[in-house]
């Protein structure tokens, strides 16, 4: 570990910059929920949005005036005044004052190209806009963070002018000067070099509390936003701006879920309290749920696969000493170790899964190698158990002689209609007939559904509910299809993953066949069987029915 270093200030802009990602649209409730979760995580600065830009942001700031956050500073965001306009009559600046926040972030132009062609004003007027805006907000009792937009592009194009914009903000009273890599095109070596030059040019030696401090705001268009942020900090920046899960326009912003653990656990900066760091993974996943985007399973630190081990040698080693293949303990960020089963698995993978499933199994048990051989044979046929652990548990129990079926499907038929009357929209319907045996009794049932898989699922549950009333709570929650050998055309083999739920738990099963309906049937039947096992574990068939 490095020697203990100065505290860093984290600044989250998920609610504004993150919301600019294509596919994200936050409601007022979404924004308030995210803000409160970030507050609980210990983020000191949370940018709420641009007051006056839309009614939702106005309402957001009003709500937080009525019910403030516990610890975090909520920050209002706005641009400098418009060219040749007075600050007192600028509607956007009046709106930012109405937001009632102690801190405000003002962004201004650093690149002469944007001043001359974007704003269509003079370089001198742009400096006046920066100075007037910050001085006015300071006179109104606000503390100011200055975001230097396109800072690194501006510095490369015209270093003297770019530095003049920061010096102007410094003289006007900004407490933080944040260098923004708005286009995301700057590489790590340039970030480090330029940040060092800025600190020296502006005399920011950190010896006086009255000096402004430097910050970094990196975009990920070159895939280096996290690296750029880390190097800026090492070169003297004390504020790091970013978003949860790296959400943001185009390729996104610096990912705070990656930055925070790197800064705190690797570089020994104070960011958030250690006990709060353990909530990082749950925060990442909650926010991905709120924005309705699938979590990145392979995200560093917080991804589902961040501490997943697949190769048999790796698994064996990590069970002896986790640090052989893990750079940190997963629980530090609220994540967990996972042992993945696949054709690359060894006995250690199988034994680890057996322990997880509560199956008594050791290396000397012949079933152990039977399970491993079956696994590799099935994966050769196209099965994949990494995302279908319910099917793998059933496979293991089958090998152990611990899979007494609670029902037996004798057969099924599915009939589909597709009618398109001229006067009506397309009408689609499917009808499934199933024959099931339970405890020696044969049941024939028919059910309709919105498509063949839905109809089959409905018919099976309808047939079994009289024996197992718990099935009424089962629902098919996700259905995924993958063509395994597309070159085979319509005879291609298909893999189907079905996710089921009983309201409390979710589980996934898999089926493979050249017939998509049969693959679906396999996955649906195993899904129902596994759900029943959750509820009737350790009971005989007759006991399960009676209960």
From Swiss-Prot:
Residues 8-278 form the Pyruvate carboxyltransferase domain. Its EC number is 2.3.3.21. One of its GO terms (molecular function) is (R)-citramalate synthase activity. CDD domains: DRE_TIM_LeuA3. Pathway: Amino-acid biosynthesis; L-isoleucine biosynthesis; 2-oxobutanoate from pyruvate: step 1/3. One of its GO terms (biological process) is isoleucine biosynthetic process. InterPro entries: 2-isopropylmalate_synth_dimer, AIPM/Hcit_synth_CS, Aldolase_TIM, Citramal_synthase, LeuA/HCS_post-cat, LeuA_allosteric_dom_sf, PYR_CT. Keywords: Amino-acid biosynthesis, Branched-chain amino acid biosynthesis, Isoleucine biosynthesis, Transferase. SMART domains: LeuA_dimer. It catalyses: pyruvate + acetyl-CoA + H2O = (3R)-citramalate + CoA + H(+). Transmembrane segments: none annotated. It is an enzyme of class 2 (transferase). Belongs to the alpha-IPM synthase/homocitrate synthase family. Catalyzes the condensation of pyruvate and acetyl-coenzyme A to form (R)-citramalate. This is (R)-citramalate synthase. It comes from Synechocystis sp. (strain ATCC 27184 / PCC 6803 / Kazusa).
